Structures are given as structure tokens and as C-alpha cells.
Regions:
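Alpha/beta-hydrolase fold catalytic core
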Residues: 1-29, 51-53, 91-92, 127
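Active-site loop/oxyanion-hole signature of alpha/beta-hydrolase fold enzymes
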Residues: 11-16, 21-23, 57-101
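Conserved HGGG/HGGXW glycine-rich cap/lid loop of the alpha/beta-hydrolase fold
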Residues: 16-65
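Glycine-rich His-Gly loop
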Residues: 31-34, 100, 125
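Conserved catalytic-core motifs of eukaryotic protein kinase domains, centered on the activation segment
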Residues: 41-43, 66-72, 131-134
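Short, hydrophobic alpha-helix immediately C-terminal to the catalytic nucleophile
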Residues: 43, 83, 107-111
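Residues at the starts of beta-strands that form the adenosine-phosphate
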Residues: 54, 93, 116-119
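Flexible "cap/lid" loop of the alpha/beta hydrolase fold
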Residues: 107-112, 117-151
């Protein structure tokens, strides 16, 4: 069983119980954990973030204290689940932060629901295929932007 210093809340959405932690007040930050993890991934940052933001850290379906049904476990399915959770909580827009597999879900959420995405932050993200990785490496290489400015 997951132990958390924060009060775990539950909502039943489409017949499945979803666990999440909600702390703080202000603009909403949605924290998405990696595969095989849960909301406790974010314990070290929830306290400091909740001083300025409303932090929502769910246990993705199939993880932690959330139900583990036969369901759609694709990144699109998880993105839809986050949209549904936020809708039930009355939240319109979020800064979505994803770690590892949660980064893939965060990117999919931002792609599917740009009107609900304030910012996207990736932490050691999964979901970046080989076709994306060289581009990210290139644009983060020192000197890339000045060289591109000279070429364009």
C-alpha cells in the first residue's frame, strides 16, 4: 500500500476509482508520474510547489491507489483520463509536468488538449522516439541558435 504524507482523495470516473493528491492554491500544476510509480514520486516537490500553486498529483489508472481495471492504458487513454479528472475537479487549464512515462502522457495531453495546457514541462521524459531525439539534442547544443540565425 502506498503511504503518503498528503491526504489522498478519490473520484470515481467512468466506473473506475482514481486516487490523487491536491495541495495548495493558485494556478494548477498537474504532476504525472512514470510507469510503475505513483503520486509519491513527487513528494519532494509538492510542498514547495503548493506554496504558489494548486498541485494535483494523481495515481494514473493501474498505479498506486487507483483502480487497476482492464482498460485503455495507451498514452492517449491516460491523456483522456487526465482531462476527465480535471473536468471533475472544475479545472480548465494546467501546467502539466511529466516524468518518464508521465512525460509521454503529458505530451499527449498537450497535443490532444492544447486549450487546456498552459505549459508543458518534461522531466527525464519517455515518449521521445528516435525521430525526435536528434532534434532535441540539436536545439539544446550550445551554439545551435546563433548558427541557425546565420543560416536563415
Amino acid at each position: 500500500m502506498v503511504e503518503s504524507p498528503y491526504e489522498v482523495q478519490y473520484l470515481t470516473i467512468h466506473g473506475h476509482r482514481r486516487a490523487f493528491v491536491r495541495a495548495g492554491q493558485g494556478p494548477v500544476v498537474l504532476l504525472l508520474h512514470g510507469l510503475g510509480c505513483d503520486h509519491t514520486t513527487w513528494e519532494s516537490v509538492i510542498d514547495s510547489l503548493s506554496r504558489r500553486y494548486t498541485v494535483i498529483a494523481p495515481d494514473l489508472l493501474g498505479h498506486g491507489l487507483s483502480d487497476k481495471p482492464r482498460a485503455d492504458y495507451s498514452v492517449g487513454g491516460y491523456a483522456n483520463g487526465m482531462r476527465d479528472l480535471l473536468t471533475c475537479l472544475g479545472v480548465d487549464r494546467v501546467t502539466v509536468v511529466g516524468h518518464s512515462f508521465g512525460g509521454g502522457v503529458a505530451m499527449q495531453f498537450a497535443y490532444q488538449f492544447p486549450e487546456r495546457t498552459e505549459r508543458l514541462i518534461l522531466v527525464a521524459s519517455g515518449g521521445l522516439g528516435p525521430e525526435v531525439s536528434p532534434l532535441i539534442r540539436a536545439i539544446t547544443t550550445p551554439g545551435f541558435h546563433p548558427v541557425m540565425a546565420m543560416l536563415t
